[in-house]
Amino acid sequence: MKIAVLLSGGVDSSVALYTMIQKGYKNIKCYYLKIWLEDELSYIGECPWEEDINYVEAVCTKFNVPYEIISLQDEYYKRVVTYAIEELKIGNTPSPDIFCNQRIKFGAFFDKINEHYDLIVTGHYAKIENKNNHYILKQAKDKIKDQSYFLSHLSREQISKLHFPLGDLLKTEIRQIAHKIDLPNKNRKDSQGICFLGKIKYDEFIKYHLGELKGNIIEQETGKILGTHNGYWFFTIGQRKGIKLSHGPWFVTEKDIQNNIIYISNSVNYLAQGKHQFLVHKTNWINKPVNNIDLSAKIRHGEKKIKCKIEMLKNDIIKVDLEEKDYGISPGQFCIFYQEDECLGGAQILQTLT
């Protein structure tokens, strides 16, 4: 069996490689995906791949496994960066990590090497089960690190080629393995924040592509101007961080795109504005739910799932009814559906209702 392993230079993917070697697989080749364009990096951050590649080389040398660096920079810009920019322009909150997995790691990369390998291995925290050639995506044992949310837009064909060796391990166990076998990167810190940005700061990425434009911050209940901001594209519904005003905490409740206005409420009023019904579209089902029983949803990456019911409407629109209110439902983000620990797929949030 020929196996390709995606290495990031981090501990997780390195332990995933070690796990496959321990299982006796010998025909293995590793790949590092180079995605960011140099002209962007010169403006918005340090080169994110020099240190990565050094660790990839060290890990592959330790295990005597060949590796190759593949440039997917043009594909990444066209399939992920342009999507994020267009969503920000229209006031939506994009989820680029979902499309980085769907369109790059398991899209453009598949297009280049898929036919040559029987299995693609990564260090993602998730599980894939095969029941009589029926593939199921499930949450990882480590619910804090679980990445099924970001894998929700993969197709069954993509999933059938994937293997996630870390799905049954806790992060603490992975660190222990890294130290036990003395991985070169055993003490490397986990990456933080948005995967698709790496070391690049999100606000710097937005500023580079969309610039800044002064606008007013208005209290929703009174209409009073409380301050100014540098562009609606820097804000998302439910956001608290970055609103540098006194007498807070303040939360973003609405964005007026045409007039570049951000509306905010204090914590007391904000908590009264939670929503439990909203519409989604552009659905990707890995496996459709057979009923509404034990159905739950994630509105964002994290541990929390909220029980819900769904109703299929016209034009492939789905109405979602959460059992409890959520306070940061934002158009453009994704709602991911689960039945128990199975990830069924997800859809883009279109608008909130009540």
Swiss-Prot record:
GO terms for molecular function: ATP binding; tRNA binding; tRNA-uridine 2-sulfurtransferase activity. It comes from Borrelia hermsii (strain HS1 / DAH). InterPro entries: MnmA-like (IPR004506), MnmA-like_C (IPR046885), MnmA-like_central (IPR046884), MnmA-like_central_sf (IPR023382), Rossmann-like_a/b/a_fold (IPR014729), tRNA_2-thiouridylase_MnmA (IPR051305). The active site is at 100 (nucleophile), 195 (cysteine persulfide intermediate). It comes from the Bacteria. The record marks 124, 333 as: Interaction with tRNA. It catalyses: S-sulfanyl-L-cysteinyl-[protein] + uridine(34) in tRNA + AH2 + ATP = 2-thiouridine(34) in tRNA + L-cysteinyl-[protein] + A + AMP + diphosphate + H(+). Catalyzes the 2-thiolation of uridine at the wobble position (U34) of tRNA, leading to the formation of s(2)U34. It is an enzyme of class 2 (transferase). This is tRNA-specific 2-thiouridylase MnmA. GO terms for biological process: tRNA modification. Residues 145-147 are annotated as: Interaction with tRNA. Its EC number is 2.8.1.13. It is found in: Cytoplasm. NCBIfam families: PRK00143.1, trmU. One of its GO terms (cellular component) is cytoplasm. Belongs to the MnmA/TRMU family. The keyword Disulfide bond applies. Disulfide bonds join 100-195. Keywords: ATP-binding, Cytoplasm, Disulfide bond, Nucleotide-binding, RNA-binding, Transferase, tRNA processing, tRNA-binding. ATP binds at residues 6-13, 33, 123.
